[in-house]
From Swiss-Prot:
One of its GO terms (molecular function) is calcium ion binding. This is N-terminal EF-hand calcium-binding protein 1. It is found in: Cytoplasm. The lineage of its organism: Eukaryota, Metazoa, Chordata, Craniata, Vertebrata. Residues 135-163, 209-275 form a coiled coil. Residues 26-61, 60-95 form the EF-hand domain. It comes from Homo sapiens (Human). It comes from the Eukaryota. Keywords: Calcium, Coiled coil, Cytoplasm, Metal-binding, Phosphoprotein, Repeat. The gene is NECAB1. The modification Phosphoserine is found at residues 4, 192, 197. Expressed in brain (at protein level). GO terms for biological process: blastocyst hatching; regulation of amyloid precursor protein biosynthetic process.
């Protein structure tokens, strides 16, 4: 959980005043952090689009999310504030009330220890430096072990719900335009990742900065779509393709557009690298290609999957959800996702 301190003094004062006014009980400060991260246009409240972008989990349908939003919106303003979030979730915390309180204490303790380490490490003896490194490593191991347990619990509960609903819900596709660039409202992070290359370069299966063959195919698809959108298009007689009954007729092409906050570009690139490496190793992933638009921090990601079921299952994996959660912080606006089925024969011909 991120530190709730803000980079902007005015935001700092606003959060402190809000926290004081609400008299938040121990552990409830997480909802200040949730509001801050989900509030993309920095107006201090969540619209339904912002709420959906943050809370959608691939299980609840759009209608269910809409119903939940209005249940939480007790002020009937079509917006949610921290008071409403706290009021709703505090009724359902159960044992997690103690968990959130412990996380709040843990967050403060770690920040305090890190500050002490930063101040004293350089002047410490070799033995003291060794002990510090050892404690940092073991603390990280313990936290990762807890994270793994939580991720297993998440997967189990979500899979159980999907089985009860007899199949995965269709993911929400968001198309939101925000008024202007989002201001930076997060804590300055330690710059521990420093790729020196100005371009994102990953050497791995299925991922190249410039993949001429598949960029050509993608461009052909884009031109075809552009032609179909023209009103004066003259359609030629279709060329029929006979498909055998046991042949997979289509594959899923997914296009994802992401506008990255400039100051978070390096961390986004690292998260993207980990995501692509994990996704490319999946049996149902045929290929992933990436384009970065020049002179702006905008990425186009093209994913080829065997079918829509495989892609929907991929969305529920830990690595995919981790990437989605990190994008809440890294992106100026929610990503735009579009999908289309293309003939599987196109893939076979080019492989």
């Amino acid at each position: 959980m991120e530190d709730s301190q803000e980079t902007s003094p005015s935001s700092n004062n606003s959060s402190e005043e809000l926290s004081s006014a609400l008299h938040l009980s121990k552990g409830m400060s997480i909802f200040l952090d949730i509001l801050r991260r989900a509030d993309k246009n920095d107006d201090g409240k969540l619209s339904f689009e912002e709420f959906k972008a943050y809370f959608a989990d691939g299980v609840l349908s759009g209608e269910e999310l809409h119903e939940l939003f209005h249940t939480i919106d007790t002020h009937n303003t079509n917006n949610l504030d921290t008071e409403e979030l706290c009021e709703y979730f505090s009724q359902h915390l159960g044992e997690y009330e103690n968990v959130l309180a412990a996380l709040e204490d843990l967050n403060l303790s770690i920040l305090k220890a890190m500050g002490k380490t930063k101040k004293d490490y350089q002047e410490a003896s070799n033995l003291e430096q060794f002990v510090t490194r050892f404690l940092l490593k073991e603390t990280l191991n313990q936290l990762q072990s807890l994270q793994n347990s939580l991720e297993c619990a998440m997967e189990t509960t979500e899979e159980q719900t999907r089985q009860e609903r007899q199949g995965p819900a269709k993911p929400e596709v968001l198309s939101i335009q925000w008024p202007g660039k989002r201001s930076s409202r997060r804590v300055q992070r330690h710059n521990s990742f420093s790729p020196n290359s100005p371009q994102f370069n990953v050497s791995g299966p299925g991922l190249l900065e410039e993949d001429n063959q598949w960029m050509t195919q993608i461009n052909r698809l884009q031109k075809l779509i552009d032609r179909l959108e023209k009103k004066d298009l003259k359609l030629e007689p279709p060329e029929e393709e006979i498909i055998e009954g046991n042949t997979k007729s289509h594959i899923m092409l997914v296009q994802r557009q992401m506008s990255v906050i400039e100051e978070d570009l390096e961390e986004f690139q690292l998260a993207l690298k980990h995501y692509v490496e994990s996704a490319s190793s999946q049996s149902g992933c045929l290929r992933i290609s990436i384009q970065k638009l020049s002179n702006e921090s905008r990425y186009m990601i093209y994913e080829f999957w065997e079918n829509s079921s495989v892609w929907n299952s991929h969305l529920q994996t830990n690595y995919s959800k981790t990437f989605q959660r990190s994008n809440v912080d890294f992106l100026e606006t929610p990503e735009l996702t579009s999908t289309m089925l293309v003939p599987a024969s196109w893939w076979i011909l080019n492989n």
